[in-house]
């Protein structure tokens, strides 16, 4: 916000906010109006002057009560050359502070990226913005910023060093167990290609680590283990059998790897598990869950089926639940974890999320020397009875 105020000799508050909206949901002056933030910026930047005069608050912040700006999304004209100057300055201060936070150990790259999105309203984390525009453009912006605003921190490491981290998955060692936490709460911990690649990377790195006896996979927060897979790629593959089959294989890399692992993996369901998220969970060697969690394969509502194991694995692992699985897959029927426990699908239920990881680690110890594997023999699946008049809501099909 202070840097935005320093641009008022070049542009209006509304123009600056409009340029900022490429990266944030609300521009700096709009936010200052909402929070009565001018005195806050003056006080905080005055304190920061202990680190250098470059942090001095813009004088205009002491002279204005409210800013003449627009609501986010309004059509505001900004000439291209002016847009570039504003953009460079705003990204310059963002990148400078991001490098400084990482270099001084104030926060991890993952926490920085995550916090900017969930707490500060960024569309993408600053390190994702850097990745999108590329190393050459980041270097150009930082060189320009150093010339315009000397004194602010510059990067001390290579571009690749700042990009080498897991964006969506937390990895913690707890009593010789690797706890993997899916952290995309803004998307209900939905899976995408990067999430599955990060899970696989952690597992592969620790598979031969003698200090790690097994893995627990859980979700961040209490709302969802994982609400499924991002479906953004699905439309472009509709009707293309070859591309669809290959994408299903690619999405199943984690599951296929777990099938052959010598160390056990326990899914700790902290909340909703749907679609691709449930397919990851059922491929783990055991499941524990909170009592109020819901499991569902909603794919049929999109005109597709669970394509990375959901149509096969449940029947092979828990044949006694075949009739229930028919309803889940063909009708999209949600079930509670108590229903899953009744058929042996969930091995242990706990009352609260606080008890979940301890239960998962106990379950890991229980199966450690005899990891359950997916049966390969033929299983009997009861016939699915199609209703006489299939309905989609009130619409007869």
Predicted regions and their residues:
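Glycine-rich phosphate-binding loop at the start of an alpha helix
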Residues: 228, 245, 252, 275, ...
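Glycine-rich beta-to-alpha transition loops that act as phosphate-gripper elements at the mouths
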Residues: 268-274, 328-334
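Structural motif
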Residues: 19, 268-269, 298
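A structural preference for short, pocket-lining loop segments at secondary-structure junctions
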Residues: 175-183, 193-242, 252-270, 290-294
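CoA-thioester-processing core
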Residues: 274-328, 359-361
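N-terminal glycine-rich phosphate-binding loop for ADP-containing cofactors
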Residues: 1-176, 183-186, 194, 234-241, ...
């Amino acid at each position: 916000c202070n840097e935005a105020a320093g641009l008022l000799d070049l542009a209006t508050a509304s123009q600056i906010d409009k340029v900022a909206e490429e990266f944030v949901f609300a521009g700096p002056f709009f936010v200052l109006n909402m929070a009565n933030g001018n005195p806050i910026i003056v006080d905080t930047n005055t304190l920061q002057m202990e680190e250098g005069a470059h942090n001095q608050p813009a004088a205009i912040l002491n002279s204005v009560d409210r800013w003449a700006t627009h609501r986010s999304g309004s059509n505001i004209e900004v000439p291209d050359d002016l847009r570039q100057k504003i953009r460079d300055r705003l990204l310059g201060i963002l990148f400078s502070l991001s490098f400084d936070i990482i270099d001084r150990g104030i926060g991890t790259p993952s926490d920085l990226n995550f916090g900017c999105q969930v707490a500060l309203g960024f569309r993408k984390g600053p390190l994702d913005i850097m990745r999108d525009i590329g190393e050459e453009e980041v270097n150009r912006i930082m060189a320009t910023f150093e010339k315009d605003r000397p004194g602010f921190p510059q990067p001390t490491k290579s571009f690749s060093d700042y990009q080498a981290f897991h964006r969506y998955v937390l990895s913690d060692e707890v009593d010789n167990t690797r706890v993997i936490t899916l952290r995309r709460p803004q998307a209900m911990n939905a899976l995408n290609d990067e999430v599955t690649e990060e899970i696989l990377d952690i597992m592969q790195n620790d598979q031969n680590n003698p200090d790690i006896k097994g893995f627990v996979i859980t979700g961040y927060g209490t709302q969802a283990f994982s609400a499924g897979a991002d479906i953004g790629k699905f439309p472009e593959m509709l009707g293309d059998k070859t591309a669809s089959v290959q994408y299903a294989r690619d999405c199943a890399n984690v599951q296929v790897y777990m099938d052959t692992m010598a160390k056990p993996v326990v899914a700790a369901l902290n909340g909703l598990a749907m679609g691709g998220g449930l397919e990851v969970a059922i491929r783990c060697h055991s499941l524990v869950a909170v009592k109020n969690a819901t499991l569902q394969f909603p794919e049929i509502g999109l005109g597709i089926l669970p394509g990375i194991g959901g149509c096969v694995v449940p029947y092979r692992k828990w044949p006694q639940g075949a009739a229930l699985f028919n309803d889940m897959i063909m009708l999209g029927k949600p079930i509670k974890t108590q229903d899953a426990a009744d058929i042996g699908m969930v091995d242990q239920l706990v009352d609260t999320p606080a008890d979940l990881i301890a239960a998962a680690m106990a379950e890991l110890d229980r199966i450690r020397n005899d990891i359950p594997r997916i049966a390969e023999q033929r299983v009997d699946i009861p016939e699915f009875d199609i209703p006489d008049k299939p309905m989609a809501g009130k619409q007869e099909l």
